[in-house]
Swiss-Prot record:
Highest classification ranks of the organism: Bacteria, Bacillati, Bacillota, Bacilli, Lactobacillales
Cited function: F(1)F(0) ATP synthase produces ATP from ADP in the presence of a proton or sodium gradient. F-type ATPases consist of two structural domains, F(1) containing the extramembraneous catalytic core and F(0) containing the membrane proton channel, linked together by a central stalk and a peripheral stalk. During catalysis, ATP synthesis in the catalytic domain of F(1) is coupled via a rotary mechanism of the central stalk subunits to proton translocation. This protein is part of the stalk that links CF(0) to CF(1). It either transmits conformational changes from CF(0) to CF(1) or is implicated in proton conduction.
GO molecular function annotations of the record: proton-transporting ATP synthase activity, rotational mechanism
Subunit structure, interactors included: F-type ATPases have 2 components, F(1) - the catalytic core - and F(0) - the membrane proton channel. F(1) has five subunits: alpha(3), beta(3), gamma(1), delta(1), epsilon(1). F(0) has three main subunits: a(1), b(2) and c(10-14). The alpha and beta chains form an alternating ring which encloses part of the gamma chain. F(1) is attached to F(0) by a central stalk formed by the gamma and epsilon chains, while a peripheral stalk is formed by the delta and b chains.
Subcellular location: Cell membrane
Bilayer disposition of the protein: Peripheral membrane protein
PANTHER family registered for this protein in UniProt: ATP SYNTHASE DELTA CHAIN (PTHR11910)
Keyword S-adenosyl-L-methionine tagged: no
Gene3D superfamilies linked to this entry: N-terminal domain of the delta subunit of the F1F0-ATP synthase
One of the Pfam families matching this protein, by short name: OSCP
Record GO cellular component, one term: proton-transporting ATP synthase complex
Source species of the chain: Lactococcus lactis subsp. lactis (strain IL1403)
Name used for this protein in its record: ATP synthase subunit delta
Length: 175
C-alpha cells in the first residue's frame, strides 16, 4: 500500500473519531493494537499470502470483540476493502497523524555518554522550542564514536553538534 492510501484510511478514522468525540479512546485503541501487532507479529500474519482470508478475518473478528463501535466499523471497512495486509501500516500512520495533530514526538539524542536526568530535561525543553512540540519523549542512545557533543533527531530534522562532525568540517576546510 502506498503512504497516500494509508494516510487516507488514517485520516478517515481520525475524522470519524473526532466527530463522535471519541478521539482519545480511538487513539488509545490504536496504540494498543500497534503494541499487539508488534508483540505477536500480526503484521506478518496479515500480509502473508500463506494464510487464507478467512483465517485473517477470524483475527479481525477477535479484535472486534473488544473494540469500540468506531474501531469496529473501521476494521470492517479495512477488511471489506481487502486491505488487511496493510492494517499495521495504517495504524502506524494513524499514530503519526495524531502525533502531528497534537505536536507529540519522540526525540532521539545520540551522545558519547549516557545523559543525566537534568540533561534529558534540558533536551526536552530544547526540543519543544526548536521543533514546536507540546510533548516530547527523549530517547538517549550512546555512541562513543561521536567523541563528544550530541546529535538530536526528531522526525527527520537533525541537529548535529557532535565533536566528530565538527572535526570533519575543520579537516575539510584545511584540505
Amino acid at each position: 500500500m502506498t503512504k497516500v492510501n494509508s494516510q487516507k484510511y488514517s485520516k478517515a478514522l481520525l475524522e470519524v473519531a473526532q466527530e463522535k468525540g471519541q478521539l482519545e479512546a480511538i487513539l488509545s485503541e490504536v496504540s494498543e493494537m500497534i503494541q499487539l501487532f508488534k508483540e505477536d507479529n500480526l503484521v506478518a500474519f496479515l500480509s502473508s499470502e500463506v494464510y487464507s482470508f478467512s483465517a485473517k478475518s477470524e483475527l479481525i473478528d477477535t479484535l472486534l470483540q473488544t473494540s469500540s463501535e468506531v474501531m469496529s466499523n473501521f476494521l470492517n471497512t479495512v477488511r471489506s476493502n481487502g486491505r488487511l495486509g496493510d492494517l499495521g501500516e495504517i495504524l502506524d500512520e494513524t499514530k503519526n497523524a495524531a502525533d502531528d495533530m497534537f505536536k507529540i514526538a519522540d526525540v532521539g539524542v545520540v551522545s558519547s555518554i549516557a545523559l543525566t536526568n537534568a540533561q534529558i530535561e534540558k533536551f526536552t525543553a530544547m526540543a519543544k522550542a526548536k521543533f514546536d512540540l507540546n510533548e516530547v519523549t527523549v530517547i538517549n542512545t550512546v555512541n562513543e564514536k561521536i567523541l563528544g557533543g550530541f546529535i538530536v533527531n526528531s522526525r527527520g530534522k537533525i541537529i548535529d553538534a557532535s565533536l566528530k562532525t565538527q572535526l570533519a568540517k575543520i579537516a575539510a576546510e584545511i584540505l
